[in-house]
Amino acid sequence: MSKIVVALGGNALGQSPKEQLDLLKSTSKSLVSLIDKGYEIVISHGNGPQVGSINLGLNYAAEHKQGPPFPFPECGAMSQAYIGYQMQESLQNELHSMGIDKQVVTLVTQVQVASDDSAFNNPTKPIGLFYTKEQADKFTKEKGYTFVEDSGRGYRRVVPSPQPISIVELDSIETLITHGTLVIAAGGGGIPVIKENEVYTGVDAVIDKDKTSALLAAHLQSDQLIILTAVDHVYINYGKENQRGLDEVSVDEMKKHISDGQFAKGSMLPKVEAALQFLEKNTKGSVLITSLAGLGDALDGKIGTLIKN
């Protein structure tokens, strides 16, 4: 039985609970079709917009004395539960409609990072909503946040994004898979924790979900990693007149595109880097990068970027 890790992008899940649920309903059809064809899948997801909104809302309440401030790791855990719940509901309903008897479980997942990771001094991970430059400058002045321009879509707050070292709940994930459970894990890249003297402590950061998904896929010895985002292909010369979507490319070709500066930091670059990390550990595997809405067409080979060694 072929094993696939599917990583859904947080930006591709929409900007509201209703929009997210509607998108997940259609995506669940494609995911369950994989199960129906005999594939074993594990699902991860991003949380950039969602965790930013949760953190912003709770901070607003705290500033207006309507509740306590919440640390970022707790906000990450809330986003895992919120997104995981909607995924579970959509997948359970679709499994039932297909006559497939399978349990779906969301596992709150911690991921270990290094306390001395250089990312803590160089925030790069976009979270939350898109703002105008004027709005971003106002937040920077009032709250000390760092903002960057995000691929022509506006300005977003950025936070540290350390490298994932290990998945704390990996054994539990494997146990659930062994018992035939459809597992949703490592949401938002996992809740970042550091380990000192055998004690885990959460830290203020957001791990790139694609890099954690690549780590998970490698540990599970998956045959394929599917990264779902907001665009149908990986593009070179993105946003220019000579923009071109990549179909099937080799690892060496992708490395050249990276060296040529083709992919934006905090956007497509970490997805491509995650793909290469997985293929370095599983030389016989493959990575498919495509849009959430276009997953069905991508599985039929009509769209998407397929990366192989």
From Swiss-Prot:
A GO term for molecular function: carbamate kinase activity
TM spans (from-to): none
Sorted UniProt keywords: Arginine metabolism, ATP-binding, Cytoplasm, Kinase, Nucleotide-binding, Transferase
Source superkingdom: Bacteria
GO cellular component, as recorded: cytosol
Cross-referenced Gene3D superfamilies: Acetylglutamate kinase-like
Pathway given in the UniProt record: Metabolic intermediate metabolism; carbamoyl phosphate degradation; CO(2) and NH(3) from carbamoyl phosphate: step 1/1
EC number: 2.7.2.2
BP GO annotations: arginine deiminase pathway
Enzyme class (EC, first level): transferase
Protein name: Carbamate kinase 3
Organism for this UniProt entry: Staphylococcus aureus (strain USA300)
